[in-house]
Each structure stands twice: as C-alpha cells, then as structure tokens.
Amino acid sequence: MFGLISLWHLFWLAVMAGILVVAHRNRETIRYKTSEFMVRLRSRFGGYTSINDHFVRDLEDGFSSQNFDLTSANSNDTRSGLDEASKQEIRRIMEEQGLGFDQARLVYTTRKFGAHGIAPDGMPLDPKVVTFRR
C-alpha cells in the first residue's frame, strides 16, 4: 500500500514539475496573452483600459502581436494606430495568404518599400546612391 501511494505521489509530482517547466519556458507568451485578454475583457464590459481607443479597436481586430504589442502603457499616445487603408491591406494579406499579423505586416512593409525604390533589407535600389560601410 505504501509503495502505491508513493508512486501515485511521484507521478503527480512529475506532472506538476512538467507543467511548471512548460509554463516557465513560455512565460513571455503567457504574460502577453493574459495582458491582451484582460484588455479585451475590460473593454467589452466598459471597464477602464490604459490604452487609447484607436489601439483598443486595433487590438480587437487582431492587429497586435508580441512583437507589435498594443497593450503597453500608451494611454497618452496621440497616434491613431494604422490608417484604414493599411489595415484593410494587411487584413487582406492575412486572409489570402493565411498569415499572422507579424508576417502580414512584413509582407505589407516589403511591398511598400518596393514601391518606393527600397530593397527588403532597407537599402535603396537607386544605382546612383552612394553608401558608406563601417
């Protein structure tokens, strides 16, 4: 009887240790998702959020990620987020290519760079341009 109880306790101890290891390895993702969930929950029920209204709408529309975090303290930020044309284009890229927000934003930015004569790495495509490397 004592051996079975000990094995049972060891099993659950190993399960809990495994859960803690996984949670520790993913703590940044868990922190971001929790923050995003709380902002959405507060805005849905009319509670106070510390981000301006433009960013709340962008967050609800899926225009946020860990790399483009809208849940940071930006209540005094006067910017209005992405303009409507950019949002529509990024949304279209996300739906057509099945990409997440970060990847769709990269595709959109790369296309905008190309339209203005800039390579995807940020270097000008103009053959007359002179650059200096360190």
From Swiss-Prot:
Leader sequence residues: 1-23
Top-level taxonomic group: Eukaryota
InterPro entries: DUF2015
Keywords per UniProt: Signal
Pfam families reported for this sequence: DUF2015
Family, as annotated: Belongs to the UPF0357 family.
Name the UniProt record assigns to this protein: UPF0357 protein AAL017W
Lineage: Eukaryota, Fungi, Dikarya, Ascomycota, Saccharomycotina
